[in-house]
């Protein structure tokens, strides 16, 4: 699950800079995040929208596996950027404290992976991204040492 931290780096800086740090709302925010991920219509709409993107994703994946100069980040953003930004905006709407970004990433990666597997018979190999994402995670932690989850995972 360490790879989850790397999923939405671009959105993270935007989110962290403007969201509220009110701890009293933490449980409410977590409940809203879970509700969003468990909303079947949300996922059905998302996968319908992304269906046309899968050919591009598969092409990038194959190129990367063959030693192309394309970084895993390109593949990931092709697949996940719209969803990551959408959910980041959701966190902002509910004034999520920035330490919930870890929760957001873990939920995002877990649910997205499971639902992609459900929707597609051929699942891209996410394992090829792990080393790259762990590196990015450590870089992120160095810049944002307040995150206890990142601190533990980067040890």
Task: Go through the PLM ranges and name each one.
Residues 1-59:
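Membrane-proximal alpha-helical anchors
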Residues 31, 62, 116-118:
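Charged, low-complexity surface segments at secondary-structure and domain boundaries
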Residues 34-64, 125-143, 147-149:
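Long amphipathic alpha-helical segments that form oligomerization/scaffold cores
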Residues 53-83:
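A contiguous binding-surface segment within folded domains or other stable secondary-structure elements
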Residues 71-155:
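An amphipathic alpha-helical interaction surface
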């Amino acid at each position: 699950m360490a790879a989850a931290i790397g999923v939405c780096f671009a959105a993270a800086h935007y989110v962290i800079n403007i969201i509220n740090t009110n701890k009293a709302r933490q449980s409410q925010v977590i409940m809203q995040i879970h509700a969003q991920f468990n909303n079947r219509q949300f996922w059905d709409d998302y996968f319908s929208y992304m269906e046309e993107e899968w050919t591009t994703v598969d092409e990038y994946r194959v190129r990367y596996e063959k030693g192309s100069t394309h970084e895993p980040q390109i593949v990931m953003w092709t697949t996940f950027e719209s969803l990551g930004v959408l959910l980041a905006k959701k966190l902002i709407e509910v004034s999520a404290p920035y330490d919930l970004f870890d929760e957001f990433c873990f939920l995002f990666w877990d649910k997205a992976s499971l639902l992609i597997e459900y929707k597609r018979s051929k699942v891209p190999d996410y394992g090829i991204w792990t080393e790259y994402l762990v590196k990015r995670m450590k870089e992120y932690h160095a810049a944002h040492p307040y995150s206890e989850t990142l601190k533990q995972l980067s040890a």
